[in-house]
């Protein structure tokens, strides 16, 4: 069942999808990270997911 409430969508986005993923080791990092917490690589990408409307 899809979530249609915009407040709940924002909560889901911040809790689940607003992260960065290391391309080298796959570790999840905070959205403000500049380097990986596990392997210290600077090769980070935003986590894939849906876009907020």
Swiss-Prot record:
SUPFAM superfamilies given in the database record: Zn-binding ribosomal proteins (SSF57829)
HAMAP family given in the database record: Ribosomal_eL40 (MF_00788)
Short name of one Pfam family: Ribosomal_L40e
Gene3D superfamilies linked: 4.10.1060.50
Sorted UniProt keywords: Ribonucleoprotein, Ribosomal protein
Protein name, per record: Large ribosomal subunit protein eL40
GO biological process, one term: translation
Any one annotated GO CC term: ribosome
NCBIfam families on file: PRK04136.1
Membership in a protein family: Belongs to the eukaryotic ribosomal protein eL40 family.
MF terms (GO), sorted A to Z: structural constituent of ribosome
Name of the encoding gene: rpl40e
């Amino acid at each position: 069942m899809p979530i249609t409430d915009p407040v709940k969508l924002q909560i889901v986005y911040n809790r689940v999808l607003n992260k960065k993923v290391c391309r080298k080791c796959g570790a999840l990092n905070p959205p403000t990270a500049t380097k990986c917490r596990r392997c210290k690589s600077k090769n980070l990408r935003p986590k894939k997911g849906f876009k907020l409307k």
